[in-house]
Amino acid sequence: GIYVEKDYQMAYEYYLLACQKQNREGFYHLGRWFFYGIGQKEDKHKAMQYYQQASHYHYSKASFMLGYMYHYGDGISKDLEKAKEYYQLALQEGYLEARKELDKLEVEK
């Protein structure tokens, strides 16, 4: 933390509270934690579930990460069509980095 000692358990509990209130940032950050193994054991399946919830609430970074997971088969089966859908959604939601990944997909086809 900033100005305080890091307490992953307390942060995790706050993110869970945020999720209970359908807070898209809470869903995204827990997805990130499970994707990268921050404060929790890495679990791509759980990461995907949290990213899906955040994406449902139009959180562009979560939509991008779902596209990434499908694009590269990171923790799930590779599916270029689903990757494209999520990258397009992220781009529509304002996440400009998705354009680069969409361009890569076009080259791969």
What feature does the model see in each segment?
Residues 1-2, 20-24, 36-38, 43, ...:
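Short helix-capping/linker turns of helical repeat alpha-solenoids
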Residues 79-96:
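TPR/TPR-like (Sel1-like) alpha-helical repeat modules
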